[in-house]
Regions:
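Canonical Rossmann dinucleotide-binding motif of NAD(H)/NADP(H)-dependent dehydrogenases/reductases
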Residues: 3-35
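Alpha-helical segment proximal to the catalytic Tyr-Lys
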Residues: 133, 152, 178-179, 244
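Short, small/polar-rich loop/turn modules that mediate ligand/substrate recognition or access, typified
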Residues: 181, 186, 246-248
Length: 261
């Protein structure tokens, strides 16, 4: 297998920490020019510093972007296009629970519901829509969406909007893969298991308590939690030419937690 990512231009959303940061590192290690964005400006600068320190000769550029604002997204994509002349890889990683914790369904407000959908699903739509004209013109491209095991089953933390929006992202993956395939554009999805990678997941882990933590790990075939690099390597596979005849697929990277056909 050759390094088919070298020299390509990759846009990664939600890149300020955790899985997003590790995806930036993995693609940079493989020779991609990385454009990383997030709404968290200082943490995003830390990502750039880490990539530059770890990867010799890395090209990691950062911009503060709110994925829920189409104007911000379009401006960012236009900037990348003008600077690089192309975009080869889009990773829609931005998402999360925005600090929310479990509430009974009747206690979930409209705003609670909408804000999670706006980040987890609308953000991926905004970015995919923005890059599509360029990818069509190029006649190729790879889009990788980051869903969750919650999108294939249910949320361990019980947050209804999170599970629903991540399931929607899997459907969005299939639909766009079908539509864009004739233009040489592949769209795939990674569904991570539980990864302690950012402040939200640390809060969720702590809130479980010792017994629930033990049950969670015992329910994973490989008997460990995931690491950000586990997810990043799956993303790199989908982004590479090793996956040239794969589209519309969702792979669970969860240590065997959900054994789905």
């Amino acid at each position: 297998m050759g390094n088919s990512i070298a020299g390509r231009v990759a846009v990664i959303t939600g890149a300020a920490h955790g899985i997003g940061r590790e995806i930036c590192l993995e693609l940079a290690r493989r020779g991609a020019t990385v454009w990383a964005c997030d709404i968290l400006g200082p943490e995003l600068q830390e990502t750039a510093a880490v990539v530059d320190a770890v990867v010799s000769g890395a090209h990691c550029k950062t911009r503060r972007v709110d994925v829920t604002r189409p104007g911000d997204v379009n401006s960012f994509i236009n900037e990348v296009q003008q600077a690089e002349g192309r975009i080869d890889i889009l990773v829609n990683n931005a998402g999360g629970v925005v600090g929310q914790t479990l509430q009974p369904l009747e206690g979930v407000s409209d705003d609670d519901w909408r804000v999670i959908f706006a980040i987890n699903l609308d953000g991926a739509f905004h970015f995919t829509r923005a890059v599509t004209p360029m990818l069509k013109q190029q006649g190729r491209g790879s889009i990788v969406n980051i869903s969750s095991g919650a999108g294939r089953s249910f949320s361990l933390t019980g947050i209804q909007a999170y599970a629903s929006s991540k399931a929607g992202l899997i459907g969005f993956t299939r639909q766009t893969a079908r539509e864009l395939g004739e233009f040489g554009i592949r769209v795939n999805c990674v569904a991570p298991g539980f990864v302690r990678s950012n402040p939200d997941t640390e809060r969720q882990w702590d809130a479980m308590g010792e017994e629930a933590q033990k049950r969670l790990i015992e329910g994973i075939a490989l008997r460990r939690l995931g690491k950000p690099e586990d997810i990043a390597k799956a993303v790199a596979f989908f982004a590479s030419d090793d996956a040239l005849w794969i589209t519309g697929q969702t792979i669970s990277v969860d240590g065997g937690q959900w054994m789905l056909g």
